[in-house]
Amino acid sequence: MLHANADRDQILTTLAPLCQGIDRDILQDFVTRMDPDYFSAFPPKTLAAHVKQAATLTPDHPCDVSIAETAGGHFVITIVAYDYFSEFATICGLLSAFGLNIEEGRIFTSAESEQPSRSRSADPYPIRTRPQGRPGLTRKKIVDVFTVSPIEGQTFAAADRKRLTDQLARMIMLLDEGQLDEARQQVNRQLVEHLGKRRSSFSGLLHTVQITFDNSQSATDTIMDIRSDDTPAFLYAFANALAMRNVYISKALFAIEDGKLHDRFYIRNRFGQKLLDPGDLEQLRLTAVLIKQFTHALTWAPDPAKALEAFDQFLDLVLEGSRQAGRKQAWAFVKDKNTFPLLARLLGASDFLWEDFLRRQHVNLLPLLKDYRDAPLIKSQATLRKELNRAIVKAKTDEARKEALNRFKDQELFRIDMKHIVEPGTSLPDFSLAISELAEVIVERSLVDCQAKLTKLYGSPRLTNKKPCPFAILGAGKFGGKEMGYASDI
């Protein structure tokens, strides 16, 4: 191993004999721009192998992958590539999708060249340009080295390795073309297939997730340390969350220590600076804890990829607005061991449920996840009337009564939908009956309020013989047959 403070000329002298056939300017550029800690992380022979991989990079070959099997059924996967926005997340997602447990990782990024190129720490949606001149000199590069092992029941034979290499190349090419969303969707689809095979009962919350920040060790980066149990797809989900929040990973190290996973991220803000605001650090800490616990429950979701995507948006909604109130609510949520698998099932249930309902009801979601178990799926009309009356009694105007009525309706619909999704034993007829009973009470109360308003304006409606005019509201179709469901509009 070379010392982290070794002179660059000394490093060049050591590596040159090991890099026969590699142009001197390629070797010099690589040594000059790589992170100093990189050279102490690997023996000279391995460093030379990385240089040779970097020398193969071209506009049509922006990524080179090497996979070596080691003792005990472990594999070392080395990825040398041009640097792209969301690249680390894409790589971690693919490794998880192939059923590989990441036991150790060393992630390094080279410095900018004299003419800056777009990268992890640049505009999230850059206009890609082809490298000019000699390949390997004009763009930042990454060297990501993972030690992995297949999870129980998973194989990683030669054919699997070839498939991973090909798919990594395709995903990196998509990033090169600026097709970030397409790359993420393809990774998500593969992740779904893998996580679906790991469906198991939820084992409760993880033990304490320890997170610390340090701004004293590095001159350029905030160091974020996370110590916890390993969870499926955490690195993928967390790296995506950081990227979407304009927090960039310049370097990362992770390994198993005393049976716990230790992740160390070297991070910067979108301007390439340390994160110094205590509020930003607290929000990042909360984001990491929520994602860590959520990915632990992810195999409960009907559609894990959909759940991950919705959870990231849900997290933004919870934390926006009053930051202090949002944090307080979210920390309380973290402490409830029963809510994460329920949230995973809800967010992974359907696009309709998230887009049309959960997004609008996010403020009520956390309390409802805790309280829903206390109420039955089907409430009697008498019970619903009593609860609705309590919700409306303080409303003094027609507009206030209408708002209270709609709020009660939305909360009850949410409760019924949630009970049906998270409790597999509930039957469709019972689900439909619960919605139909609610609809009866809502329509009845709407009639009472409208009748009171119109009577006040025009008096009671009467027939030509002066007797009160009777009328009825008839429910046809699914309402009349008590077969209402998710698409029914009340």
Predicted regions and their residues:
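Non-catalytic regulatory/linker segments of enzymes
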Residues: 1-490
